[in-house]
């Protein structure tokens, strides 16, 4: 009995404190870096306010300025791509992805709900598919819009470095700077996006090749009483 150690012994208290601290730190590290963001409901105000970046794979491109994103926290370091696979079927991906609405850019409207298609709408869709479909991208979520889409900046690695997807759309003229004041998000890039648009317009790239016949997506949606 003489060798027994009280639970109040300094060494016991120190070990207990260290163990508790390790659990607390580990839990917070898991929540911040390892927990999957499955849907927009998992995006906490802290994530949006701090503009925390998320890494994942583009699983579907359904329009010229949005896509489905499967979050893969930790990337290759946590086994994604070799130990852990991203689902491929629509049923397996149900309720497991974020719908991303690219920030700061508006693509020409495709034909739906009885509305005619804008020129370059299919080109914009094909461009985005070629640029990001099946690739891993980094998103910076800014907000959630009225359609439950995550308005975000998206960046993807290319041979020439990391590219801002919105900027590249504007640069090539298959997207224009977002015009609506409702839900507009640019991060810190609005002036950059506008300078890229001015150059695309000067060089008559993409939609700007239409000259006076060109109607922006924002103007087009106003004509058909549908705002986004």
From Swiss-Prot:
It comes from the Eukaryota. One of its GO terms (cellular component) is membrane. The lineage of its organism: Eukaryota, Fungi, Dikarya, Ascomycota, Saccharomycotina. Residues 52-210 form the TNase-like domain. The keyword Hydrolase applies. The chain crosses the membrane at residues 13-30. GO terms for molecular function: endonuclease activity; metal ion binding. It is an enzyme of class 3 (hydrolase). It holds the Pfam family SNase. Ca(2+) binds at residue 106. Keywords: Calcium, Endonuclease, Hydrolase, Membrane, Metal-binding, Mitochondrion, Nuclease, Transmembrane, Transmembrane helix. It comes from Meyerozyma guilliermondii (strain ATCC 6260 / CBS 566 / DSM 6381 / JCM 1539 / NBRC 10279 / NRRL Y-324) (Yeast). The keyword Metal-binding applies. Its EC number is 3.1.-.-. InterPro entries: SNase_OB-fold_sf (IPR035437), Staphylococal_nuclease_OB-fold (IPR016071). Belongs to the LCL3 family. Signal peptide: none annotated. It is a single-pass membrane protein. The active site is at 101, 109, 149. This is Probable endonuclease LCL3. Its main location: mitochondrion. It is found in: Mitochondrion; Membrane.
């Amino acid at each position: 009995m003489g060798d027994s150690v009280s639970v109040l012994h300094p060494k016991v208290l120190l070990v207990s404190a260290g163990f508790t601290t390790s659990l607390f730190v580990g839990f917070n590290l898991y929540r911040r870096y390892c927990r999957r963001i499955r849907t927009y409901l998992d995006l906490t105000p802290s994530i949006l306010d701090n503009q925390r970046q998320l890494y994942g794979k583009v699983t579907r491109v359904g329009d010229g300025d949005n896509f489905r994103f499967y979050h893969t926290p930790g990337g290759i370091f946590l086994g994604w791509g070799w130990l852990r696979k991203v689902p491929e079927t629509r049923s397996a991906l149900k309720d497991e992805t974020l719908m991303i609405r690219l920030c700061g850019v508006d693509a020409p409207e495709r034909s739906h709900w009885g509305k005619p298609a804008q020129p370059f709408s299919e080109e914009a869709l094909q461009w985005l598919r070629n640029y990001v479909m099946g690739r891993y991208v980094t998103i910076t979520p800014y907000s959630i819009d009225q359609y439950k889409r995550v308005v975000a900046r998206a960046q993807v690695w290319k041979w020439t470095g990391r590219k801002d997807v919105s900027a590249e759309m504007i640069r090539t003229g298959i997207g224009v700077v977002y015009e609506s004041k409702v839900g507009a998000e640019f991060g810190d890039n609005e002036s950059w996006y506008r300078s890229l648009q001015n150059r695309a317009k000067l060089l008559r790239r993409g939609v700007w090749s239409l000259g006076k016949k060109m109607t922006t997506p924002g103007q087009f949606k106003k004509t058909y009483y549908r705002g986004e």
